[in-house]
Amino acid sequence: MRATPLAAPAGSLSRKKRLELDDNLDTERPVQKRARSGPQPRLPPCLLPLSPPTAPDRATAVATASRLGPYVLLEPEEGGRAYQALHCPTGTEYTCKVYPVQEALAVLEPYARLPPHKHVARPTEVLAGTQLLYAFFTRTHGDMHSLVRSRHRIPEPEAAVLFRQMATALAHCHQHGLVLRDLKLCRFVFADRERKKLVLENLEDSCVLTGPDDSLWDKHACPAYVGPEILSSRASYSGKAADVWSLGVALFTMLAGHYPFQDSEPVLLFGKIRRGAYALPAGLSAPARCLVRCLLRREPAERLTATGILLHPWLRQDPMPLAPTRSHLWEAAQVVPDGLGLDEAREEEGDREVVLYG
């Protein structure tokens, strides 16, 4: 006999509350019931359909899924920690992330620190059992990494619109004492099917600062996005400046279709990063080249701040030139520094252009 969907609890969103469950879901993570069959080929994540399953498949999934208050958990998503979820009273789709309840404070602290922002994802509801924590997020429609992988290069006008949203999200985090540490393209996801609006997700691993000092000691970063100061022997580094470097890698990848630093051998890859050895692709406008160089500076103190990025001419909505001011940020935005190691990069890579994942 099918269970009757429970009514959604009244109250504001993004709140934590104790569950009233029909079944004990705290003993283990939800398990999806599957028919026994032979191995099935799996598509890579970028080729999976963005639209929801057809009605018959969804009905079958709901009938066999795990019940969680007014929600049912459906198929697990890539990585195993998140599940597709359906809010029964409204039929709205969500992504449910599951954590041990002991991690509740660490998981929710970054979201509690940040005021709501249109370009930063936050849980719409949090349910807590005795052993597991369930955070529900609005479903998204692909990410920037998949977009670059499928299109190779993003035209400058479109890239500027998307990158402004990315920089806005980072500036919001930095202004409220949050360092992302592991910033990369796949953390920026599309909130709409038209792929026009980006939001930053996965703040759970961010570092919440307790004061103005943003010094970090851990070496937490994706190899392709890691800053040279993290690879050095320095005891600490600026977390915010490291985020800006990673954002510069993301911008370069959007415009070029490949990472600025590439090598199959990690030692050689890290050597290129330490030297700042990259070559800008041909055809970029002068403002775009300027912004990339202002972000991928070997010295952290020479990079633009996240707020300063938004003042750069490449991201200005007004195409008319502005009168120069004495603002430090404006002066920094106007500087077009010579990239360190550019000649080395040209000698090493020549004219070849390696496409992402190709």
UniProtKB/Swiss-Prot annotation:
Name the UniProt record assigns to this protein: Tribbles homolog 3
One function term, GO molecular function aspect: ubiquitin protein ligase binding
Entry comment describing in which tissues the protein is expressed: Highest expression in liver, pancreas, peripheral blood leukocytes and bone marrow. Also highly expressed in a number of primary lung, colon and breast tumors. Expressed in spleen, thymus, and prostate and is undetectable in other examined tissues, including testis, ovary, small intestine, colon, leukocyte, heart, brain, placenta, lung, skeletal muscle, and kidney.
Species of origin: Homo sapiens
GO cellular component, one term: plasma membrane
Entry comment, domain topic: The protein kinase domain is predicted to be catalytically inactive.
Chain residue ranges for the region called Disordered: 1-54
PANTHER family, A to Z: SER/THR PROTEIN KINASE-TRB, TRIBBLES HOMOLOG 3
Keywords: Apoptosis, Nucleus, Phosphoprotein, Protein kinase inhibitor, Stress response, Transcription, Transcription regulation
Keyword Transcription: yes
TM regions (residue ranges): none
The keyword Disulfide bond is assigned to this record: no
